[in-house]
């Protein structure tokens, strides 16, 4: 499995240009080290919208889904630092999916990613997963592309956290998450319009109305980088 574990935390939000410099400093030098110090957090990656807009995409790769309800993680979620409390309100239109990894093929750290938020038609989850698993092997070998990863949200059985309270309990959720990785933006956009276009996904078993975006890698780290 190419992702570094059986689970992942995938998040999207908007960050204003005015808040972004401090956000990136905090995120790289306090937040990533804090999260990567939690047992089971294996890699953290932050991306910015490729079109220069306000969008941010962050993915944490986790040993397994139980990490999301672990005492060590909950302790951090319920005791955010003063700097974190100051930055949290700037995370606008947050979507936060706590996922099990369903399929993972090829590279997971690349200069560009296409993320797609989708859901299966009732009764067609198996069809959709099988079709995307088959496609993943072809995508990983195409010029400009290196990998395709499919995840499904499954909320852990935990109480609302202090971080959620600071954000106003307004987090959205993506049901299924598809992340295509590559080194060429045009190749990712072509993938988004063809093999992973809305018509193609509907034929595989997805509901209409997917959400998608292309992002550029800003920073990626593992626990070993924090030493």
Each predicted region: which residue ranges?
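Macromolecular interaction modules
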Residues: 1-227
